[in-house]
């Protein structure tokens, strides 16, 4: 009877070993026998948990690999367009022979256009480097008390000329003492991106309003515009990288909203996008305490 028990346990160990080999060689389907008691049952349970964990890690790595491949394709596309245009401009400048007034004027115009394209590529590289820092965790976000009113005013400064040109008025409503804990510089970049998005979707001008409040649980910032709103088709994609809505007027990169979401996510916050009943878009930011 003792010998029979030894043979049974050896057979179970051999079966478990065979299953582990199949797993190691990458078989998709595997079946670990159930052992009711003893060391083999404990070992079998640990192997099962290890396999599940390794499969989950492999799936996550594959998702990250696919994401990186998509990112590289998007970046290549974003760079290819201005570089192709610059190549064509260089070719056309070479064909402009002579030193007449008309030739000089055309060369100056095309050189100006090339400079604009170079600036665009430079801006894209800067934004991508910031996104890379956020993704890799190397971006150092400070945690300090931020006045929400000061943050909004600072965030709107770079957009003052654009708002004037497009007839957009900034409306503020909130308590001067309301605040949250976060990084002022990164938070300002996120808010600027959301405000810029609103301006780009307001073809006929209007009010770009920011309201805020602080509760015992979170601080809230609400940004609304009087633009065309977000279509049902676009709403699920609004925070995706390189996604540009059909109603945007300017040729941006489609990274601003994704960056804004990433910045606040790093600060224990969330951003939600929705449409207003009276028209236009609404972005609600919550930063938890």
What do these predicted ranges mean?
Residues 269-270:
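Conserved glycine-rich
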Residues 142-145, 164, 169-179:
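Conserved catalytic submotifs in the C-terminal HATPase_c
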Residues 225:
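Acidic ATP/Mg2+-coordinating residue in the GHKL
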């Amino acid at each position: 009877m003792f010998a029979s028990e030894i043979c049974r346990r050896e057979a179970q160990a051999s079966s478990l070993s065979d299953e582990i080999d199949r797993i190691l060689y990458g078989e998709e389907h595997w079946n670990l026998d159930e052992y009711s008691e003893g060391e083999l049952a404990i070992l079998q349970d640990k192997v099962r948990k290890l396999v599940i964990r390794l499969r989950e890690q492999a799936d996550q790595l594959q998702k990250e690999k696919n994401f990186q491949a998509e990112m590289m394709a998007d970046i290549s596309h974003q760079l290819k367009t201005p570089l192709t245009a610059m190549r064509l401009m260089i070719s056309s400048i070479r064909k402009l022979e002579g030193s007449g007034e008309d030739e000089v004027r055309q060369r100056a115009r095309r050189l100006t256009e090339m400079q604009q394209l170079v600036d665009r590529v430079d801006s894209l590289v800067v934004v991508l480097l910031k996104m890379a820092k956020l993704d890799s965790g190397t971006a150092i976000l400070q945690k300090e008390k931020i006045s929400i009113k000061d943050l909004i005013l600072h965030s709107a400064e770079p957009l003052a000329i654009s708002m004037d040109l497009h007839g957009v008025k900034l409306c503020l409503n909130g308590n001067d003492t309301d605040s949250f804990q976060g990084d002022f510089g990164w938070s300002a970049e996120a808010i600027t991106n959301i405000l810029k998005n609103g301006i780009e979707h307001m073809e006929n001008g209007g009010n770009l309003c920011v309201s805020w409040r602080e509760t015992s649980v979170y601080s809230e910032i609400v940004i609304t515009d009087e633009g065309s709103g977000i279509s049902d088709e676009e709403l699920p994609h609004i925070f995706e990288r390189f996604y540009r809505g059909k109603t945007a007027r300017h040729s941006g990169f489609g990274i601003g909203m994704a960056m804004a979401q990433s910045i606040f996510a790093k600060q224990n916050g969330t951003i939600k996008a929705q449409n207003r009943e009276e028209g236009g878009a609404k972005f609600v930011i919550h930063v938890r305490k």
